[in-house]
Amino acid sequence: CVYVVLKSYAAKERQGVVRRLTDRNYWFNRSTAKDYGLMCLNAGLRTSLWLPLIGSQLVGTLVVARALRDYFGFPEPVIWDPVTLTILYTFIYFLVDDFSRFALHAAMHRVPLLWRLHSTHHSATTLTPFTVFRVHPVESGIYFFRAFITFSLVTGVFVWLFGRHLSIIDVVGVNAIGFIANAAFANLRHSHVWVGFGRLEHYFVSPAQHQLHHSIDLCRGNYGSVLSIWDRLAGTLELSGKRRPLTFGLVSQDRIEQSSQPVISAWLSTAGDSKVA
C-alpha cells in the first residue's frame, strides 16, 4: 500500500518520504517504544482475558439466532441466490460495523472518562503503522466487545432469517475482508505519508484526514474509519485540503511527555487531566 502511494509522489517528495521511512529514529524513539510495548501487552491480554471472558463471535451469533427463534419463531423460508445473499450480508455488516466504530470513536473523544483511556493513543508524537496498536488495555477491551456485539447481532439475524443458506465461508470471509482492508489502510493512516482523496473525502476517510485527526491544532473531527458519511451527518467532517505541517500528541506538554513513561505505568494509568479533543 505504501509502495503504491510512493509511486504516485513526485520524485523530490518521494525521496523525502523514503528518507523518513528508512530513518532509524523514526521507528525507534520514546513514542514508538510505547507503541511496541502496548502492542505486545494488549495482544497477550486479548488472548488470555478478553476471549475467555466474552466468548467467540460465532457463539454470540448462535445465541442471537436462537433468541430470535425462541421469541419470534421460525421465519417464513426465504430463498435467495447465494451470491446475492453474500453481497447483502457483507454490505449490511460493513455499514453496521463502520458506524459502530465511528460512534464509539466519537464517544471516546466526547465522554471525559473514555477520553482518559483514548488519550493514550493520541499521546503519540510520532505516527507509524504500529501506532494503531497504541491503545489503553481497557479501550482495547471496549473495542473488542464492540466487534463482538456488532458481529453477533448482524450475523445472528442473518442466520435466523436465512439459516443454512448463509455459509460459514461467507461469515469468515467477511471478517477476513475487513481485516485485510483495515491492515491496508492503517499503515497509511498512522504515518507521516500524506495521502488525500480529494472530493472522495466526502464519502471515504483518507489517511490525510486521519492525520489531521491526530494533529494538536487542526481538527476535532474525522472520527470515521472507512466511510466519512457519518462525520458529514454529524458535522465533524474535515477535508484534508493542501498538505500542511502537523504536530502530533496532546495539547498539554506534560501529557505529551507521558509517551516516555514505562509501558507498565501507562498500562495502569490514564491521562486524566488532558483536554478532551
Q: Whereabouts are the PLM-identified features?
A:
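Coil-to-alpha-helix initiation sites in intrinsically disordered, low-complexity, charged segments
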Residues: 16-20, 27, 31, 78, ...
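Specific transmembrane helices
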Residues: 1-71, 89-101
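Residues that form generic nucleotide/phosphate-binding pockets
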Residues: 39, 233, 266-270
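Membrane-embedded catalytic scaffold of the fatty acid hydroxylase/desaturase
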Residues: 41-53, 60-65, 76-247
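Residue-identity detector for glutamine
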Residues: 15, 57, 209-211, 253, ...
